[in-house]
Design a protein with these regions (language model features):
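Amphipathic, Lys/Arg-enriched alpha-helical "gate/interface" segment within cytosolic domains
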Residues: 2-119
Length: 119
């Protein structure tokens, strides 16, 4: 699994490696959540390449399934995505999810890390 553990002052988070596929299917997602549990990390930093392409097509249901699994296990997720992916229906979805505290999309890793470190 191409991930690392980052320990902050109050929280640890799992960081996906930019440029590497990480979650290709539901089994990979469960493995990632299990890895979080093993390392006492309740947060995840992901990049576009870490997510399946279907994640960005809302009609596939993949985004809903992925985010619901993270929510069920109380894992907070920050995703660093290029602006080119955050458009259309997926862009509207991002606007809605960014209002909550479970999943947010950022254009810079620094912003994502700040959000993960908060609270």
């Amino acid at each position: 699994m191409d991930v690392g553990i980052v320990h902050g002052a109050d929280h640890a988070y799992v960081k996906g490696e930019a440029g590497h596929a990480l979650v290709k299917n539901e089994r990979d997602l469960i493995d990632l959540i299990g890895f979080c549990g093993e390392h006492h990390a309740d947060r995840v930093l992901l990049f576009a390449e870490n997510l399946p392409e279907k994640f960005f097509d809302l009609s596939s249901g993949e985004a809903g399934m992925v985010l619901q699994k993270f929510a069920n296990y109380r894992v907070k997720v920050a995703a660093v995505l290029p602006a080119s992916l955050v458009r259309g229906k997926f862009g509207e979805f991002v606007c809605e999810t960014n209002r909550g505290g479970q999943f947010r999309v950022f254009q810079s890793p620094d912003q994502a890390v700040q959000w993960l470190a908060a609270d």
